[in-house]
Design a protein with these regions (language model features):
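Non-catalytic interaction surface on structured domains
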Residues: 46-49, 67, 73
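Alpha-solenoid HEAT/Armadillo-like helical repeat scaffolds in large eukaryotic proteins
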Residues: 17, 50-51
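Amphipathic alpha-helical scaffolding segments comprising HEAT/armadillo-like alpha-solenoid repeats
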Residues: 11, 42-49
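Short linear motifs in low-complexity or flexible loops
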Residues: 38-39
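N-terminal acidic leader/helix
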Residues: 2-35, 57, 64, 71
Length: 74
């Protein structure tokens, strides 16, 4: 369960922006990762996986973030 409804709403907004952006900013992803809770980890990783799968040459930054969070979530 999210910490608060406001936290959940804020996270959904940020995740939506990351998902819609072809090249999401590192600052925006850093902000999400600082506030990331168990309820949003899978959603965040799914967005990152979709971006990596859709790009022939995915960014090292996205790959590093996926690696970090898949290890942290295990």
């Amino acid at each position: 369960m999210p910490i608060t409804k406001a936290h959940d709403r804020y996270m959904r907004i940020l995740l939506e922006h990351i998902g819609e952006s072809k090249y999401p900013s590192g600052e925006l992803m850093d902000r999400v990762e600082i506030l990331l809770d168990r309820d949003h980890v899978d959603d965040y990783l799914e967005i990152l996986f979709e971006k990596v799968e859709a790009d022939r040459y995915p960014s090292k930054q996205l790959l590093d973030r996926i690696a970090r969070w898949t290890l942290a979530a295990s």
